Swiss-Prot record:
Region annotated Hexapeptide repeat domain, chain positions: 282-438
Entry comment, domain topic: The N-terminal substrate-binding domain adopts a Rossman-like fold and has a binding pocket for GTP or GDP-alpha-D-mannose. The C-terminal domain consists of a series of tandem hexapeptide repeats that adopt a beta-helix conformation. The beta-helix forms several protein interaction surfaces involved in assembly of the GMPPA-GMPPB mannose-1-phosphate guanylyltransferase complex. A loop extending from the C-terminal domain (C-loop) is involved in interaction with other subunits of the GMPPA-GMPPB complex and may be involved in allosteric inhibition of GMPPB catalytic activity by GMPPA.
One Pfam family linked to the record: NTP_transferase
Family named by the database record: Belongs to the transferase hexapeptide repeat family.
Region (C-loop) residue spans: 373-402
MF GO annotations: enzyme inhibitor activity; molecular sensor activity
GO CC annotation terms, alphabetical: cytoplasm; GDP-mannose pyrophosphorylase complex
Protein name: Mannose-1-phosphate guanylyltransferase regulatory subunit alpha
Record region (Substrate-binding domain): 2-260
CDD domains: M1P_guanylylT_A_like_N
Length: 438
């Protein structure tokens, strides 16, 4: 038996994903018509030995229970139990696993997967599991690894490993100088003995906590709970060079979802994966899937996802890389490319939407133009990953990026919105360029 753990953090995480995360938890943001971590769950469910998937974070239970209920119903026939375990406070990337160790160990699984909730990938979980089980008995963790450019590697966990055995000899999280172009993908398979290591860290932290609390009178002086454990720095780094940490390099597509701009890039790749795994989800032939009459949607340039409840005028043109959410209305002559349109949005007649995300319940008037600047990886650099630049450059000016409309934004007719970010519930009255509209 196998289990999987998906780590999703909490509300104070994912701030760079605003304004999209202001009304929807980042792990539930839809990519290619499915919530982000639904893709993780789908990958885990492909493994015949998976019996339970645990989502660990500190989002309120009320924000996650609807999604978990939907997933449980979807995979009930596969005999997979899906649960959300809410941390009482932020416990770090490994603290939550240790806190819920009894739930993870219940049923005596032979190993369990750990997936960071903010990564997007074509997850080769079966290959990762097979690789791990062929390692020596001392192996505790196997990391899924990929290559990045020399400069970009500094933004990730870097590892040095033996290419024949996979044994990791050195691991550094976000090094200040070059270590290796092989990086940590945030996907792991762990032996159950890893909890012995976590227990040692927890108890040593307890002694440190007690000492600091005594010296400081009350708190421990750093604002962290005793159970707060950093997976990368406190677990992986010490395991390197002990023949207990291994890595499996993969050529598969992989990306992090850190900023709103990276959502469009991830959306494109998940739509591309559908062609291989779920072609029935795509509207690439211009036919609305799930409709009894098989009526023509509109002109489609693959790959495009259209929710069955969306209304699209036959003269509209969609794609490539477009996802249309539930209840969306798209009027005559509309052109949408490289964009995500969320539920209940309205795109009125002859509007152009390029490299943008249109928030839930937003309306764009007729003959308007909403356009952003793509932030894709450099196609001329092998292994290049998504750049996640800050909002502002060194001169204090807004960096060009995709255009984002928060929920329930009103864009009037015949206006232009270029490289701008609009916070929720704003009613615009003029055109904007390179601005954040508060």
């Amino acid at each position: 038996m196998l289990k999987a753990v998906i780590l999703i953090g909490g509300p104070q995480k994912g701030t760079r994903f605003r304004p999209l995360s202001l009304d929807t938890p980042k792990p539930l943001f839809p990519l290619a018509g499915r919530p982000l971590i639904a893709h993780h769950i789908e990958a885990c469910a492909q493994l015949p030995d998976i019996r339970e998937i645990l989502i660990i974070g500190y989002y309120p239970q009320t924000q996650m229970e609807g999604f978990v209920g939907d997933m449980q119903a979807l995979y009930s026939s596969s005999n997979i139990n899906i649960r959300y375990l809410q941390e009482f406070t932020a416990l770090g990337t490994a603290g939550g696993m240790y806190h819920f160790r009894d739930q993870i160990r219940a049923g005596n699984p032979r190993a369990f997967f750990v997936l960071n909730g903010d990564v997007c990938a074509d997850f080769p979980l079966q290959e990762l599991c097979d690789f791990h089980e062929k390692r020596p008995a001392s192996a505790l963790v196997t990391i899924m690894s990929t290559e990045a450019t020399r400069q970009q590697s500094l933004h990730y966990g870097c590892l040095v490993f033996d290419r024949s055995s996979g044994a990791v000899s050195h691991y550094v999280e976000k090094p200040s100088s070059y270590v290796s172009t092989f990086i940590n993908c945030g996907v792991y398979v762990c032996s159950m003995d890893i909890f012995t290591v976590l227990a040692q860290i927890f108890h040593s932290r307890g002694q440190e906590y007690s000492c600091q609390a005594f010296c400081n009178g009350n708190g421990n002086g750093n604002g962290r709970e005793q159970g707060h454990i950093k997976w990368e720095q406190e677990v992986l780094t010490p395991l390197a060079g002990t023949d207990k940490l291994f890595a499996m390099p993969v050529p598969n597509w992989w990306s992090q979802l850190k900023t709103a701009g990276s959502a469009i890039y991830a959306n494109r790749h998940y739509l591309g994966l559908y062609k291989k795994t779920h072609p029935e989800r795509l509207a690439n032939v211009g036919i609305k899937r799930g409709e009894g009459d098989g009526s023509l949607i509109c002109t489609v340039h693959p790959d495009v996802y259209v929710h069955p409840s969306a209304t699209v005028h036959h003269s509209a043109v969609l794609g490539p890389n477009v996802a249309i959410g539930p209840g969306v209305t798209i009027g005559p002559g509309v052109r949408i490319r490289e964009s995500i349109v969320l539920e209940q949005a309205q795109i009125l007649d002859h509007t152009l939407v390029l490299h943008s995300i249109v928030g839930r319940g937003s309306t764009i008037g007729a003959w308007a133009r909403v356009e952003g600047t793509p932030s894709d990886p450099d196609p001329n650099k092998p292994f290049a990953k998504m750049e996640n630049p800050p909002l502002f450059n060194n001169e204090g000016k807004l960096n060009p990026s995709i255009t984002i409309l928060g929920c329930f934004v009103q864009v009037p007719a015949e206006k232009i919105l270029l490289n701008s970010i609009v916070l929720p519930h704003k009613e615009l009255s003029r055109s904007f360029k390179n601005e954040i509209i508060l």
